[in-house]
Amino acid sequence: MRKSNLITVLIVVIIAIAGAVIYRTQFPAPAPEATLLPEGIGIAAAEAAVQALGNQGKVVLILPKRGNFKNPMVEVQQAAFAKTLARHKDLTLSATESIEVERPGTMGAGGMDPAEFQQLVQRHADATGFVSFADFPEFSKEALASLKGKKFIVVGGANPALKSLLTGGVVQAALVPRTKPAASNKKPGSAREWFSATHEVVTAANANSLP
């Protein structure tokens, strides 16, 4: 090999190594909980659906949408949910929908259009339950009445009326961040353990634990 060619090869190798170092510095590998926690949320949401629906029926999954932004963590939740639900043959995932959660000038659960959520539910009249990774909108009493007969599992606790929604039987289960530390101090390992360490499932039975 000519000396000039050897120098060129060495320069290319050095540039490649430098690029790899810069990439790892600027874009380090995510901490385990970065993917394990959303996976655990997806698993726990499916388990809550099975519990609430009696292991049978049709489920519609509702994902949050923020314009054109694609959140990879939501994709992890979705995949874990679908995989866990698929183990229960009599409970099927009949549809997956997305709903805008950040209308201009709003934030949190208030950023979702209640009318859009209501229309989504009406489009799936044959569904037994709905699992919303987009939280639950703030409905009027009249609008809530139109949701009777359906069961809802909600991921998120931004709705200030969540406690009354649970005790009133509108929402069957909510997956929310823990208000008190988990009983175990052991560092979580699996995705499900990460969920249990940081979140909890709230139903009508323990809704008083909510603030």
Model features per residue range: what roles?
Residues 2-211:
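A residue-level marker of the well-folded mature domains of exported/periplasmic proteins
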